[in-house]
Amino acid sequence: MKGMFRTGLILFAAAAAACAPRERTLVLLSTNDMHAKIQNFPRLAAAVENCRDTAQLVVLVDAGDRWTGNAYVDMAATPGMPMIALMNRLGYDVATLGNHEFDHGQAFLGRMIDSMAFEVVCANVTSDTCTFPQLPPYVVLDKDGIRIGFVGVVTNYEGPGHPAGNASSFEGLEFPDPQAMAMKYAAELRPKIDLLVLVSHMGDDRDVELLGKETRFDVVIGGHTHVTVS
């Protein structure tokens, strides 16, 4: 009986260890407003690969405005494609839209999204046109058992009612309030995931304003206003 009791303790201890949560390190790396600065990509790629060599789990995210700003990229046979090719090769996971994604029209952007090997999410753009795909508002990634939700939003403040840019680029599209849509999907996702990330192209002032109203986001990855956050 004494030997059986010891065996029972060992089995119980093993079962308890198997059920205990594992401690893992997750690193979120982000870019925003790269504006086709292709000359900086080697340094970016080196930093990302170095992090992947040292961290257990790495997720790479972009918060919009990937092209418009460099003649080589903007005058390529397919404007913007050199940046997308490099982003695909580096292995981005998730991105949202910036206002400059619309610079060459909806049909062009739709084709570019098809060429992106990463998830593109935006919760506050709806389309009734056949030239622009209806994007998912969010995506959930599972990284070694950690469920991470990414909600994307883009500014609609400069239009007003749509992002900054030529109004003809936005015909047939609607851009509901990005903060309201972020809050809607935060409420929907929060019970289902471990980590909730907002990928925002609203600007730092609007991001801070949102965080005063919405506490369910664990991380905000922002862009649009080109502000360095320390």
Regions found by a protein language model. Give the residues of each.
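Hydrophobic h-region of N-terminal signal peptides that target proteins for export
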Residues: 10-20
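Acidic, metal/ion-coordinating pockets
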Residues: 19-230
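Bacterial N-terminal signal peptides that target proteins for export
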Residues: 1-8
